């Protein structure tokens, strides 16, 4: 969405920098997390614990989420595990903001009787998955192991979820620094203004050894 607006801003040489998400076909810089590396680290924890039938829930209208999925696929392939299409649930961002999405996740998981672990692409999906599992009478990690990207609340320690922690403050700081440099240099192209941050992972107790 709004791709035409961004192209017009670029045509007018107005500096634009993307935060967290971005468009591949624009020459604007961005500040992002290395989501593929993050996926490899999260999946390694599940695979090392003996999980093979791993489900994932991702947004197809969000490039960062697609990167997370690709990282998951690569991690499973590298470890000799099959990525099963029906173990992946795709949705649009707006859909995941609806309370009814919990029922959709519940139906998805009930269709995967061999699934033992779930990868959540962000905190919103994580909350929906927890609610769906509660409706199903399932426990974490006794029935399902769980990992989450971009946990955006400060409760990950209390929740005990293995996750990557959202770096909102640092990302905002990096965006501001780079945007000021672009304004000072009168640049609108990505000339080394992009920053790719290393993921920060928290190891909780949401993964069960099999």
Question: For each predicted feature, which ranges?
Answer:
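Short acidic capping loops at alpha-helix termini that bridge into adjacent secondary structure
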Residues: 52-53, 83-87, 139-146
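Short beta-strand/turn micro-motifs composed of small residues
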Residues: 20, 32, 58, 90, ...
